[in-house]
Amino acid sequence: MLAPFAYFFPRIALFYAVCGAYDVGRNSGLNLSTLRRYFIGNGFPTWVLSPFNILLDLLSLPYVNKGVYHLGDLPPAYQDEVKRLIQAARDANFVGQLEEAAKKHPRTMVFFRWYGVNKDTFFNVPAFHQPWKYIQTIGVSVFNKKVSTSLHFGFMRATLRILYNLNDMKDDSAYIVVGNTTSYWRENKLFIFDDTLLHQSFNETDQTRYCLFVDMIRPSLFPGVMRALISSVRILTQSFKFIYYQNWKVIER
């Protein structure tokens, strides 16, 4: 499919080749397997969106994309929202509310906010529905025992992915890998990263893992532009959200 496209549209093909080379080159530990996965595997949609994502990188300057972040790398107002959200999540009894539903499926997800719009679910957490300035998506993911994801890329860089493990893990068999970075949930409950980088989450423990799942608008001198783009994405993806989370059981009611 790619060869005929390059033959009939050589300039567009060259443009996409350059954008894709830059985009995939951001992954540390780059190898042939990563290239194959990006260009002809599950990273293909990320390649298709690479010009758009590069534009988002430019709009985010002077805040350079670090790939993997510490909380202190974010502006103070962003840090404050993250801390408030984490405290609200700690105060909610997610384990008790989700334990029974999660037993039926390897991976479960419940959303309280989706790209800037609050969602009604079977579990009411009023603190999640406060007017957030930067937080766009709030969910809780549940990994059953001995359940991991495959290696995959996210699609869009208008947001940063923020994960916070809600329950205490007993050993280092639960962790996330992004490029050359491995973070163990037993040691560090908070992990912030650009999810368009190749990543994989592991739960090889005998525990169910409950994780706060958040998308936060990237720091930018043009936050209004970022919000408008995110709103557009919400409208475009609302009716086929299942494609994003086809390997998850999304609980709504």
Where does each model-flagged region fall?
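Short, conserved beta-strand element in jelly-roll/cupin
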Residues: 142-144, 155-171
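A short glycine-rich, His/Asp/Glu-containing loop-to-beta-strand
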Residues: 127-145, 158
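Short beta-strand His + acidic residue motifs that chelate non-heme Fe in jelly-roll/DSBH
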Residues: 149-151, 174-175, 193, 199-204
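A short hydrophobic beta-strand segment most commonly corresponding to one strand
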Residues: 161-166, 192, 207-223
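Transmembrane helix interruption/hinge and helix-loop junction motifs
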Residues: 2-15
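Conserved metal-binding segment of the jelly-roll/cupin
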Residues: 184-198
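Non-heme Fe(II)/2-oxoglutarate
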Residues: 12-128
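A short beta-strand-loop-beta hairpin characteristic of the jelly-roll/cupin
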Residues: 167-187
